[in-house]
Amino acid sequence: MAKLDAYFGEYGGQYVPQILVPALDQLEQAFIDAQADEDFRAEFMTLLQEYAGRPTALTLCRNLTKGTKTKLYLKREDLLHGGAHKTNQVLGQALLALRMGKKEIIAETGAGQHGVATALACALLGLKCRVYMGAKDIERQSPNVFRMELMGAEVIPVHSGSATLKDACNEALRDWSATYETAHYLLGTAAGPHPFPTIVREFQRMIGEETKMQILAREGRLPDAVIACVGGGSNAIGMFADFIKEENVRLIGVEPAGKGIDTDQHGAPLKHGKTGIFFGMKAPLMQDEHGQIEESYSVSAGLDFPSVGPQHAHLNSIGRAEYGSVTDDEALEAFQILAKGEGIIPALESSHALAYALQMAHSEPEKEQLLVVNLSGRGDKDIFTVHDILKEKGEI
């Protein structure tokens, strides 16, 4: 039986209850078979093009880098059906679930974007859907909760722990342990137990593949850097995957610095965590001196995650990718700059990557550079959060 690598360097693996190993083995084999099946690939591509709206545009920012020699492009995953990059890999995994004869889908969600993407794929493909979501996230993302319910999903609130994404992940895994014979756990990011990080990367890699073709057509060369926000890391690994072998292209991931990296309110495990076991994988993890998981924090629910995907950990450890961080305030500023400057309202998650790119452009205005930001999602879900913050600050 063909096998995929379970590790990226020292990171990854499959740290799960023994009861789940057969389900993960079945998933790995189904994925390997599907990747070799022309009909499966054709069906996936058809859904991406005719239902989700691929390829997505690559948009040159006309106004954001005025006064500098930077050319800044946005890869417009915000234009995808469902509002974010999540739709790509969800369609792939839902097709895999059908291929394995599963009738139900379990998912976890933070910002609600993965939940919405899962709900729409299940509605389209006739699968029953239940989504675990932290009670705190349900409060801050009520429009997405109703979207999921409109499309027939059952949204299950999780009150344990910090009542956020990590707790929803734990509940979803617990459910799957009891129901894996009939249900597929549709994990929402490039993290978790093997083979999920690899499956999610492969079902997101068209982001970077399209970007490469589009930038070559527009500029006649590859970008100097591609920049993406990193929570679990799926939009970033989707952008990075096709550029890893292009040694002259910098890969820059941006973690949430929250209220400041020097505070205890951030979500930057790559730079400020220690290796641990969490969510079925070995990866950098925010933990205290006793090894207890520390709460992550970000204004953006989708980046509020105390660990990170194992391939990012590996790329960081070998120096192939670099990882910076951006605070809530910097992300909020970038959110407003893009809205006012280009007429595009980005997700708060994506605003972290944009903020980093703008810092690169304006800190060296004389440097000629070609940058691509993965605009991983649109900001409709965040307008009430931003409104409340700006009102509190007296800015509106």
Swiss-Prot record:
Q: In which pathway does it act?
A: Amino-acid biosynthesis; L-tryptophan biosynthesis; L-tryptophan from chorismate: step 5/5
Give the EC number(s) under which this enzyme is classified. Answer: 4.2.1.20
N6-(pyridoxal phosphate)lysine: residues carrying this PTM: K86
Which Pfam families does this chain map to?
PALP (PF00291)
* Source taxon at top rank: Bacteria
What are its cofactors?
Answer: pyridoxal 5'-phosphate
What are its GO cellular component terms?
A: cytoplasm
Q: What does the record give under GO molecular function?
A: tryptophan synthase activity
Q: Supply the InterPro entries for this chain.
A: Trp_synth_b_CS, Trp_synth_beta, Trp_synth_beta/beta-like, TrpB-like_PALP, TrpB-like_PALP_sf
| Cited SUPFAM superfamilies | Tryptophan synthase beta subunit-like PLP-dependent enzymes
Does the record carry Glycoprotein as a key word? no
Cross-referenced Gene3D superfamilies? 3.40.50.1100
* Role description: The beta subunit is responsible for the synthesis of L-tryptophan from indole and L-serine.
The entry assigns this protein to a family as follows: Belongs to the TrpB family.
Q: How does the record describe its quaternary structure?
A: Tetramer of two alpha and two beta chains.
The protein depicted here goes by the name Tryptophan synthase beta chain
Species whose genome carries this gene: Aliivibrio salmonicida (strain LFI1238)
